Amino acid sequence: MQNFGIFFNPNYERTEPIFNLLKKLHKNKDLQFYNFPQQKELFPDFIKSIKKNKLDCILSFGGDGTFLRASKLSLEFDVPLMGINLGKLGFLSESSLSELEKSIDDLKKNKFKVQQRMLLKTVVKRDNKPIFTSSALNDAVIYKGKEPRLIDIRFYSNKRLVVETRCDGLIISTPTGSTAYSLSSGGPILSPVMDAFVVTPLNPHVLSVRPMVF
């Protein structure tokens, strides 16, 4: 691996040590670093504009939120994603800034494993026509919004009604997202490599309605 896309938490202020390290790696190890159009203004000149067919890997600098945003770029460019934790919560990150040089050496020597993660495809329809489509690495949430009342939920699997209840909302979570919002709402933890998802009702009116794994 020689060509790396760089994705940053735009609110992170202590960028100078990171850019100095990347410049050193660029110069001493002949590595090429590229920025993405939405973050172009954040980077010095040696980090060039992205070339789609050039990327080998994307490096995400930040916490879990930054990693989740970068995951969409990983999907778009069809390359692996590695997280470098700069935030308070780095559950999804494999490396830290102090380990970055060693981690990149391992990538160059092909001393790594790519772990496949499940994605959710979410489609919102109105009058049976799609009005919104997106992919999610962690979860999709149906929520009552600003309304003070419960909403009626009917959940189907393979066109069969599984549960009907009144609640504040519903979380549909991948194994990756099972340790986040779903867990805080009483859902179980799934192994990251499982081919399954969790449906977690938010404050259901009936106590017998519990989180379900599919």
Task: Describe every region a protein language model picked out.
Residues 6, 60, 172:
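Redox-cofactor binding/interface segments in oxidoreductases and associated redox assembly factors
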Residues 15, 66-70, 179-184:
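Short glycine/serine/threonine-rich phosphate/pyrophosphate-binding segments
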Residues 32, 78-80:
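Proline-centered loop/turn at the N-terminus of a beta-strand
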Residues 59, 82-84:
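Hydrophobic/aromatic beta-strand patches that form the interior of the parallel beta-sheet core
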Residues 60-64, 71-73:
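N-terminal glycine-rich "phosphate-gripper" loop used for MgATP/nucleotide binding
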Residues 164-168, 172-208:
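Gly/Ser/Thr-rich active-site loops/lids in small-molecule metabolic enzymes
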